[in-house]
Swiss-Prot record:
Main location: cytoplasm
Location within or outside the cell: Cytoplasm
GO BP term (any one): L-arginine biosynthetic process
Organism: Bifidobacterium longum (strain DJO10A)
Function: Regulates arginine biosynthesis genes.
Annotated Gene Ontology cellular component terms: cytoplasm
Record's keyword annotation contains DNA-binding: yes
SUPFAM superfamilies reported in the protein's UniProt record: C-terminal domain of arginine repressor (SSF55252), Winged helix' DNA-binding domain (SSF46785)
PANTHER family, per the entry: ARGININE REPRESSOR
Gene3D superfamilies, sorted: 3.30.1360.40, Winged helix-like DNA-binding domain superfamily/Winged helix DNA-binding domain
Annotated metabolic or biological route of this protein: Amino-acid biosynthesis; L-arginine biosynthesis [regulation]
Domain of life of the native organism: Bacteria
Name of the protein this chain belongs to: Arginine repressor
MF-aspect GO terms: arginine binding; DNA binding; DNA-binding transcription factor activity
Length: 170
C-alpha cells in the first residue's frame, strides 16, 4: 500500500479500459496517443494503437488548443488544465454548485464519509463526487438519501468530510 492508499485495480474489460482513458484525460495533459498508451500501460492496461484510436473516437475525444498553446486531447466538455492552472478549483466550484442545495448533513465514520441528501438526490450527489479525481477517495455508494464515500483511511475521511461540508456551505 502506498502513502496515498491502495492502487485501483481494473479488470481486463473494455469498460475498464474506457474508464481508465477517461480518467487519464481528466488528470493529465495528453498530447499524443503514444503518451496515453504509456499511461495505460502504467495502469496495467495494454492496448494497441488501433484500439486506442477507436476508443478515443467512440468517446468523442478531440484535440483542443489549451491557453498556453499546447494541443491536447479532451473529452466532451472536460477541459484539461495547462501547467500552473488548478484543476481542483474548477472541480470544487462545480461540486459546490451541486452540493450546496443537496447536502443536508455530513459525518465521518472510520474511513467512510456519510453524506445525507433529500430523498432521491443521493445518486446524483454520488455521481458528482465520482466524476472528480479526489485524492484519497476510492469511490461512492448511494441509496435514496444517503451517500457513503469510501476513503483510503480514517484521517482522509475526516478531512474529506470537512471539505465536502465546506463545499456544501458555499
Amino acid at each position: 500500500m502506498s502513502e496515498t492508499g491502495p492502487s485501483l485495480q481494473r479488470p481486463a474489460t473494455r469498460a475498464a479500459r474506457l474508464s481508465a482513458i477517461e480518467q487519464a484525460l481528466a488528470t493529465h495533459i495528453i498530447t499524443s496517443q503514444s503518451q496515453l498508451s504509456k499511461i495505460l500501460i502504467d495502469e496495467g492496461i495494454a492496448v494497441t494503437q488501433a484500439t486506442l484510436s477507436r476508443d478515443l473516437d467512440e468517446m468523442h475525444a478531440v484535440k483542443t488548443r489549451l491557453k498556453d498553446g499546447t494541443v491536447a486531447y479532451a473529452v466532451g466538455r472536460s477541459v484539461v488544465a495547462s501547467e500552473g492552472e488548478d484543476v481542483g478549483e474548477r472541480g470544487e466550484a462545480q461540486m459546490s454548485r451541486v452540493l450546496n442545495g443537496l447536502v443536508t448533513s455530513v459525518a465521518a465514520a472510520g474511513n467512510l464519509v456519510v453524506v445525507h441528501t433529500p430523498s432521491g438526490a443521493a445518486q446524483y450527489v454520488a455521481s458528482v463526487i465520482d466524476k472528480q479525481p479526489i485524492e484519497g477517495v476510492l469511490g461512492t455508494i448511494a441509496g435514496d438519501d444517503t451517500v457513503m464515500v469510501i476513503c483510503t483511511n480514517d484521517d482522509t475521511a475526516v478531512s474529506r468530510s470537512d471539505w465536502l461540508l465546506s463545499l456544501a456551505s458555499k
